[in-house]
Amino acid sequence: PAAPTTADATPTAAGEAPGHNADAPFPPEDSYISFIPQEGKEGQEFYKYERLILQMIVRYGEKVMCNVTNEEGQEIPVSVIEYVVSDLKQDELSFHNPLHRQILTEAAAHIHDAGFTAERYFLAYPDPAISKLSVELISNRYQLSKYHSKSQKIVTDEERLYELVPALMINFKYAIVSEELKHMMSALQDPAIANDEEKCNAIMKRYSEMREVQSIMAKRLGDRVVLP
């Protein structure tokens, strides 16, 4: 399976969480600045992975996908929701669709509630846009996992969360960063931005950071789980 990313940009063993910090506050869903236009996003490669990750969150969000050792040497279970939040925050990335960001923020806020089940929570969510999307994500029982070739046993996605979720995250991050870089270059050619030194420098700094993320993800893709 593809190795998750760590905060210092070195691979961890599969099954470890990326710079996991359960107490880290999750940023508000409207704080993410993207250069990718909302229009036409559904046709983009990153959007396919974004939706698959969201499907994992709504279906299996509270499920433990791996353990991580804390500073005291204790094994701490990490849920799908915690893993996704931590992995995105590490590179200051987020989902592109505002509704998807809202769902992830809600999931992160309630993951430690007693008896929390992502599927039940989002199906009963008062905002009809969220509950409707949740129905779509849950009712479409599309499996990324295939038959095991030797035993013909069906391996479920839930049994492979420890490898599927990191692989989806690597594919998503590479795709969305590549798209952001393209639109950043266009933004820098806009005279209004090119003539504003502060804006220009801020974009150039972020561009440099994203190029580094892109490079790391490109290396990880060489060892990825094959996904459709």
Regions found by a protein language model. Give the residues of each.
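C-terminal tails and terminal domains of large nucleic-acid-associated
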Residues: 166-228
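Extended acidic low-complexity intrinsically disordered regions
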Residues: 1-2, 204
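A sequence-level detector of short, solvent-exposed, charge-rich linear segments
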Residues: 72, 122-126, 141, 149-153, ...
